[in-house]
Amino acid sequence: FGRGRVVSYSPSGAVEVRAAGRAFLDMRARIERQIEQRTLMLSGVSHDMRTPLTRLRLGLSMLDHEDRSELERDVADLQRLLDDFLDFARGEAASGQPEQTDPHALAAKAVAEAQRDGCSLMLAPPSGTGLVALRPLSIHRALTNLIGNALRYGTHCEVSVVISKRALCLRVEDDGPGIPEDQREQALKPFVRLDPARNQDRGSGVGLGLAIAADIARSHGGTLRLGHSDRLGGLCADIVIAR
């Protein structure tokens, strides 16, 4: 359950063991119910907020181009912020069960999408082979967040995948200012933006990109580690998941 896997379980054995098992099942049910209710509520909020945003876009389309360009960027920023809030609140509730997945293919897809947008990044040669139990959509989201974060604060980034017998490591490195060691734990918390190296002026957002990636890593029984990139000199972000 801690790794995001719902396994059928029926308490058995001694009285104390059965009591502990039933208490765990009750706890799991309460957690699942809370996640479902939160997701439904925020999905409704998201829908209600998208309607006025659509009206704003329609109204802006009637203005002259030179008058509406900055306003359209503001509306687009609001849309991205809304999507980030919803993704963070949704967590893993709608992402399905883990399936045997090729991590190299996932990384290649995320890199190709960023390259199509004109971003400067590359995928390192693969290290190791094999399938890993992952939620593909969630891991793709985590990689996209890390790549977007890297390119927001740097000019170039590199993505690499290492598969060993015991673990999977998805790494994103950049040539930006990095994050001081004493601030890395803080950087993984939601709604945290660090100053002055990584501040609001560097791009839109509310500090959810790393938090969402860390949440996805934890839901797979893994972790998101932040460090210094010896190769590029900036931040090194590792998603490490046990196999």
Regions found by a protein language model. Name each.
Residues 4-7, 11-26:
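HAMP signal relay modules and closely related sensory coiled-coil linkers
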Residues 179-192:
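Short conserved segment of the HATPase_c
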Residues 120-130, 134:
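Conserved catalytic submotifs in the C-terminal HATPase_c
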Residues 92-97, 131-134:
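Conserved micro-motifs of the catalytic ATP-binding
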Residues 156-166:
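Short beta-strand/loop element within the Bergerat-fold HATPase_c
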Residues 157, 221-228:
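Glycine-rich ATP-binding loops of the HATPase_c
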Residues 31-80:
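Membrane-proximal coiled-coil signaling linkers
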